[in-house]
Amino acid sequence: MRKDLLILTDILKANVAPALGCTEPGAVAYAVSKAREILGEEPREVYVAVDRDILKNGMFVSIPGTKEKGLVFAAALALVCGKSEYKLEALREATEEDIKKAHKIVNRKAVKIVLEKDAEGLYIKASVVGDKHRATVIVKDAHDNIVYEERDGVVLKAKEENLKEDKSWLKAKIKEFTIEDFLDYCDSVDFKEIEFIGEGIEMNKKIAYAGLNEEVGVGIGKMLKRQIRDEESLAKALTAAASEARMSGYPLPVMSSAGSGNHGLVAILPIAIIGEERGYDREKIIRAITLSHLLTAYVKAYIGVLSPICGCGVAAGVGMSAGLTYLLGGSRKQIKGAVSNMLAGLSGMICDGAKIGCAYKLSISVTAALEASKFAMENIFIPSDNGILGNTAEESIKNLGRISVEGMKNADDVILDIMLKKQ
């Protein structure tokens, strides 16, 4: 394998990790947990400042193992029992007694969540106050990337001292590669280097079948279950059911992709289900999912970690379309064509926060990615003179990034304003 591609293994490991519940409340819980540990005494209250996308995505999503929603309860529960060693799964050991204590914290209004209007990109600042001390932690650029720690005005860690742990530079480095590079990597990398990718198959299938067979959410998974007739409809039903369970707070982790659990569901499940049902060997399936993860991360690097564009539907959908076409034996031209087909059809899906309705968006994404791949396998490619498409798949992705970063600057403000008025 080409030496310049070796870093893609590190990029994969930085992007693919387990997450319990929605990533945004998990990230807030992680920051609060770390601040509470630094505090070194009984916490009295916590102040959390977040960027608009963290606020938007954490507002109406359920907290695993509880019947509660939102960032306030996530922060309160982290004050009681959060463990920073588990990072985005900081709340995974919460008990019923812990939940009762968290309710008391919320009821005495000891948790304040505020919008940091000037924050650029992903930003969480958690300040935990006790009777004698105060501790502050800042998470930036990635959900699990702590860049600053302080206790009573004394800086314990700053970004400059934390470069080895800061993976945001590593995630951004993916922009230096092309789809050809990703394909060379997936074809030639030693299977042992990417075997860990397979852990996400079993992890995500477990919550998918829970969502399909148990009473969760509003019944999206159950309805799609009644429509299962082949491996493609099974893949769609399981992906949507997994998201519905996750957004409802079902207490099982998922394997994330590019910093999001829902991204991981789309990037992994459809390829795994279709591959297994059609009898493909496990190595081929994992190599295809590896391509899916790489394309998902590539799109996210351009549209932003948190974006007005639905990353679960569009970014992970692009990854899925490429990975599925790879699995089915498509040529490199067809794989790139599937990417452009997907962007031609679904690039306009917005992100209006994490919630149960995301399950429906994932269902739509899987359907679109299946069709984008089928079109490509039949050598049907949406022409490059259509809309935002570029002359190459990479150009199309970069154009989507321009729309997200330059063209939708006010979209999140409007979306968030609409959501806040419903509280």
From Swiss-Prot:
GO molecular function: L-cysteine desulfhydrase activity
InterPro entries: Ser_deHydtase-like_asu, UPF0597
Top-level division of the source organism's lineage: Bacteria
Single GO BP term: L-cysteine catabolic process to pyruvate
Family according to the record: Belongs to the UPF0597 family.
Protein name (record): UPF0597 protein TTE0269
Phylogenetic lineage: Bacteria, Bacillati, Bacillota, Clostridia, Thermoanaerobacterales
